[in-house]
């Protein structure tokens, strides 16, 4: 079942959503609503080419990476040891999301439009969204961004302008989280790229227990 949201700051029980995870339509992208959504594993998907409605998803099987389980291939270890790139955190959030937005606009069904970018920038300004940047000398060549609540990271998008830069960003994020008590990276959707790095499915109820830990 798909629910229509109004101005009330609430969401229906995620267990009542459609088989593909679609739970609700409408509402807004305010920081308060976004924080409430992510605290239950609900995330927005905005197919702005085809409609102006915000779609809210909450799949019952969650594709995640546990920081301690991230897989670093031999080729990635070699790349990291060469020192060609360096990685920073939260130095260029706006640039990372701009690159991700440009990439998504080229894709069919692009979702990262102006309203979404503004929403995540507001979350970053209030300390609820973060970025990882990959640099080659002084040139930004890759990165990712997502929402941070508690000890969990909800990945939203990544980009690479050179091979493996987004993988490098994700590896550094996982290592940082593992060293600092991070619990889980929510990947939202399965991809071969993420599965090769240690991603796996867990049931929503198990996922919810993790993301709501203090």
Model-derived regions: residue spans:
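N-acyltransferase acceptor-side catalytic subdomain
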Residues: 1-214
């Amino acid at each position: 079942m798909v629910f229509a949201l109004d101005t009330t700051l609430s969401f229906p029980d995620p267990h009542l959503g459609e088989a593909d995870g679609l739970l609700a339509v409408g509402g807004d992208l305010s920081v308060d609503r976004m924080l409430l959504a992510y605290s239950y594993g609900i995330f927005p998907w905005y197919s702005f080419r085809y409609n102006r409605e915000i779609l809210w998803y909450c799949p019952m099987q969650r594709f995640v990476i546990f920081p301690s389980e991230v897989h670093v291939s031999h080729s990635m270890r070699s790349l990291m040891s060469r020192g060609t790139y360096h990685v920073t955190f939260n130095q260029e959030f706006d640039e990372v999301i701009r690159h991700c937005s440009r990439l998504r606009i080229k894709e069919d069904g692009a979702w990262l439009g102006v309203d979404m970018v503004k929403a995540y920038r507001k979350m970053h300004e209030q300390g609820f969204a973060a970025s990882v940047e990959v640099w080659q000398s002084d040139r930004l060549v890759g990165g990712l961004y997502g929402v941070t609540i508690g000890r969990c990271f909800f990945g939203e998008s990544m980009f690479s302008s050179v091979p493996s830069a987004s993988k490098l960003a994700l590896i550094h994020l996982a290592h940082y989280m593992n060293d600092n008590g991070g619990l889980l990276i929510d990947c939202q959707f399965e991809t071969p790229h993420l599965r090769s790095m240690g991603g796996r499915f867990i049931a929503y109820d198990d996922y919810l227990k993790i993301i709501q830990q203090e």
